[in-house]
Amino acid sequence: MKFQANRDVFSEAVSFAVKLLPQRTTLPILSGVLIETTDTGLQLSSFDYEVSAQTQIAAEVEEPGRVLVSGRLLAEIAAKLPNAPVQFSTEESKIVVRAGSANFTLLSMPVEEYPSIPQVDGEAGLVPAEEFAEAVAQVGVAASRDDVTPVITGVQLEVGNNTLGLVATDRYRVAVREIDWDNGTTSGEAQTALVPARTLTEIGKTFGHSGTVSISITNRDDRELIAFTADKKTVTSLLIKGNFPPVRRLFPEQVDNYAVINTAELIEATRRVSLVLEREAALRYTFTADGLTLEAIGSEQAQASESIDALLTGQETVVSLKPQFLLDGLGAVHSEFVRISFTKTENPNKPGPVLITSQTSKDQSGSDSYKYLLQPNLLLR
């Protein structure tokens, strides 16, 4: 096997191929990247039985072949090569990588033992890449990081005729985003896919500037897969098995008690006042006709408070919220103002979830395509 490729193109391809590989694996062979020659250049692939990545690039191929090499090591080498064409060749069980005056010799891995890369050829729909990446970032923050309950470590994709919904929860909060969807299926049936949040987050970052992203869901050999394709790059992922909780029903249809606040001011005030708090403590937010007051009591008698402008509609309200959870929602709103709506429970002494949505101005509500529901901490009275 022998080829020559552009250094930047080759480095980016290797980096993409290994990005989703686990840091540690019980099977060393799964840490490799598979390089194969094609009629038009090269195909680079990786697979750990759960996630695969595959990309194609142009190259001048002198001798066809396929080889398996340590992925992360090759990625580090490719990123540090001098600005010159990459010359790649195999000599028995060794791989030689040259660029300019830099030379590297690596051992190849047993390519015949490498598993087959999954191929997804089902019907696909299209989403705008930038909007999809934004939606993934907005919703992904609410996904659980506790592997004890795998079903909530994912983001639920809900496919409709013209929209794609993304939903995530960690039991303490729920995030929902709707985006436009060009449904490529002939059946028109609604579909759902529960994708690991970590994988989906990396996919969003990778394909964020790709124009459009093709998404297809398929069932092969009793394995449910989802595939994302753009710019000659494809990522597949096994879906999480289990029933995602029906969290959409938690969102109220209408709320008459809410406050409108400048988003940046609320973020900065929350960051300042929370400085005195212990790690898991909550901040007290008091909403009145005069505005919003933030209060915190920390250890060693440390205290902090701050008041900012807020336009309140409805009755005065006091809630306690974990600052980081609130900041995650505020950071995802992407509007100058934010609306914080206060829901009710059957117990008048127990505040209901707080709903965060965008607000175009103090007087005009924004798009409801993104919603973030946050469960308040019960106040100790």
Where are these regions (language model features)?
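Structural preference for solvent-exposed beta-strand-turn elements
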Residues: M1-R381
